[in-house]
A protein has these predicted regions:
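Helix-to-loop junction immediately C-terminal to a conserved catalytic motif
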Residues: 65
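Conserved ABC transporter NBD signature motif
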Residues: 73-81
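Catalytic Walker B motif of ABC-type/P-loop ATPase nucleotide-binding domains
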Residues: 174-177
């Protein structure tokens, strides 16, 4: 089946089975961050991930997006378990199937805006349209020039570059870690609406956020508590999310 120009194995974008993640502390001590999480998310879904600090939100996103292998359990993205791929195929998979918006932007400071945005396209052998890049950045209220070094930009402007890079790649699945965190209220709304539109086009979007108002406009909210999904709320309201988060603090 095809949607939005890309081929889907079926309508399931990401399927997680009994995922747990532990980290080693010292020689003989481990800490459990994620505990027996199972989840299935379809194309066209916009999923927000919320929870108090330390609940495992960013770790879950890293496991879902092929960046951090689970200690146990399975992650399948578009029909593929990325943790079974060899390094070369995994790199290709990340370039072609998914896009990641990092909380710390993950840009190349020595390169200008245009080169940062189009680097994944060049690595994949795809054509580069600088006019399309400029148009996308303009839609996000980006003020700097394409020739500006990203190291000279504010945090908010760097975030817009990182988001444009993820969107311009036209991937099937987008993983976003606090994509609106460094932005003013106007830019925050623009970024969210851009992600919302991607889901409306049939893509799958995951978003870690602390913003209850934005999360209330997603299709599904996952509330994490102590490394587990304590609640899943379909079409969440702000009141439901607030109450769920207050409960998760106990």
């Amino acid at each position: 089946m095809e949607s939005g120009g890309f081929v889907m194995v079926n309508n399931v974008a990401v399927k997680v089975s009994n995922l747990s993640k532990e980290f080693l502390l010292g020689q003989d001590k481990t800490v459990s961050i994620l505990k027996d999480i199972s989840l299935s998310v379809n194309y066209g879904d916009f999923v927000s991930i919320l929870g108090v600090s330390g609940s495992g939100k960013s770790t879950l996103l890293s496991c879902l997006s092929s960046l951090s292998e689970p200690t146990s359990g399975e992650v399948v993205i578009n029909g593929v378990n990325p943790y079974t791929l060899k390094e070369g195929k995994l790199a290709k998979f990340r370039r072609q199937d998914i896009s990641i918006i990092f909380q710390n932007y993950n840009l190349v400071p020595a390169l200008p805006v245009l080169e940062n945005v189009t680097l994944p396209l060049r690595l994949s052998g795809k054509s580069v349209d600088s006019n399309k890049v400029r148009k996308m950045l303009d839609s996000l209220n980006f003020k700097a020039e394409l020739s500006s070094l990203v190291s000279t930009l504010s945090g908010g402007e760097q975030q817009k570059v990182a988001i444009t890079r993820a969107i311009i790649a036209d991937s099937k699945i987008i993983f976003a870690d606090e994509p609106t965190g460094a932005l003013d209220s106007v830019s925050r709304k623009l970024i969210f609406e851009t992600l919302r539109n991607l889901a409306s086009q049939g893509k799958c979007v995951f978003m870690v956020t602390h913003d209850i108002e934005l999360a209330s406009k997603t299709d599904r909210a996952l509330i994490l508590k102590d490394g587990k999904i304590s609640r899943q709320i379909i079409k969440p309201s702000a009141d439901e999310l607030y109450q769920a988060l207050e409960t998760s603090k106990g």
